[in-house]
Amino acid sequence: MKKKFGLAGLVVLMVMLALGAAAEEGNTIIIGCDMYAPYTYKNGTGEFVGVDVDFATEAFGRLGYAVQFREIVWENKQSYLDSGEIDCLWSCFTMSGREDEYTWAGPYLYSRQVAMVRADSDYTELSQLAGKRAAVQASSTAEKALLRRENPNVPEMKQVLCFSTLGEAAAALRKNYVDMVVAHEYAVHSLVDTLPDLYREIPQTLYANELGIAFGKGTHEALAARLQTAIDAMREDGTAKAIVEKYGFDAEKSLGGGN
């Protein structure tokens, strides 16, 4: 009995170690993401595409890894990391304000948070939205920013409604349940470009963000460091610039942090 128990315990330990070291030793990195165009989304054939998909494929490829993107419930992202179902998060994920919560590689891109309103509304400035209703993605930095109001550019809202996805937040705006949606600028650009008769961007910055790749806190430090080296090389050799420009980004601002 003792021998059987010892063997079972050893098997459990080996499985746990394998899960924790999967990213370091395996050939495929499992990346958690949500649908957040133009960063991570699916094309007409159901394949993951986007800035982050191209970035991750190239960066991890230089390290000898293939990548597999997996759509997750974004507000439950921590549980996916803790369980080992995914190796990291790479989906327009903000480092700013979360520096001590994960093991990071990055920043690989810079972004701004902006407001989107209905195309038929009269709003032209952020100040006009004070006392109104806002929609954000749950567990996002936009949610925290609107509720805490630590940035003077952020107006005080009457109500902040949180949704599981940006698409749901945009639908709430379309149905006039809220007065604005706050999200990353190029995600807003994508929605406005796709549905210009429905949405319009307020051309002011609420606050700036740094975007990074998040591994579980205290895990995969060596891999994160190697990934950072690959990202730095992509900046130097022009690959990063080619990727962001492919999706219509301003390379100087997105890669250099300019506003």
Give residue spans per PLM region.
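Acidic, polar ligand-binding/catalytic clefts
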Residues: 57, 61, 66-128, 199-205
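Extracytoplasmic small-molecule ligand-binding "clamshell" domains
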Residues: 24-93, 162, 226, 246
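Ligand-binding cleft/hinge of the Venus flytrap
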Residues: 56-65, 142-163, 190-196, 245
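Beta->alpha turn/N-cap motifs
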Residues: 32-37, 70-75, 84-96, 119, ...
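Extended ligand-binding regions for polar small-molecule ligands
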Residues: 53-62, 123, 127-128, 132-133, ...
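Periplasmic-binding protein-like
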Residues: 34-35, 110-117, 185, 189-229, ...
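A ligand-binding cleft/hinge motif common to bilobed small-molecule-binding domains
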Residues: 76-79, 92-101, 145-148, 172-207
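A conserved helix-loop-strand patch within extracytoplasmic ligand-binding domains
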Residues: 65, 106-158, 218-220
